[in-house]
């Protein structure tokens, strides 16, 4: 209540309150990143708030948490490549964090994605061709989000990847 009052009247927060607020925001973001499943709406709101803090909240320790979470998500995806929900969740997280100035080092995530891309053509389409196409579209969108050039995601046999 005191912080809201001070902000509403345009007064700056005392340094002790500002530091406390940044710490709580940092921990809230960390908890959202570590939660299963991730509440993306809450995480997005927290990240937007953190972006107004001049980079003091989105620091190296949160970068480490993001990297670890994304690495776990790609490992889960390697184990369950046909589950579109896992692809979409990783893509949604990547969309939120990739533009942030956090110095993310996602080489393991990108390598896992590349490995999955090589396996995607061998996945059986099952009985639902539309679901297989949706999975492929989601997977290619994830690749684009992770920084792969669209042409590098094409296979020599596009029928197999879209099957």
Segment roles from a protein language model:
Residues 1-163:
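Extended alpha-helical scaffold segments
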């Amino acid at each position: 209540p005191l912080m809201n009052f001070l902000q509403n009247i345009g007064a700056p927060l005392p340094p002790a309150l500002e530091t406390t607020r940044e710490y709580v925001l940092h921990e809230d973001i960390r908890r959202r990143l570590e939660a299963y499943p991730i509440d993306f709406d809450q995480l997005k709101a927290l990240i937007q708030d953190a972006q107004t803090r001049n980079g003091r909240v989105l620091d190296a320790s949160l970068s480490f948490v993001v990297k670890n979470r994304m690495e776990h998500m790609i490992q889960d995806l390697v184990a369950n490549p046909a589950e579109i929900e896992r692809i979409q969740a990783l893509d949604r997280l990547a969309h939120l964090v990739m533009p942030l100035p956090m110095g993310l080092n996602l080489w393991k995530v990108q390598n896992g994605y590349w490995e999955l891309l090589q396996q995607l053509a061998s996945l059986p389409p099952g009985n639902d061709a539309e679901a297989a196409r949706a999975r492929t579209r989601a997977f290619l969108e994830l690749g684009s989000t992770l920084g792969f050039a669209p042409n590098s995601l094409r296979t020599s046999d596009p029928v197999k990847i879209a099957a």
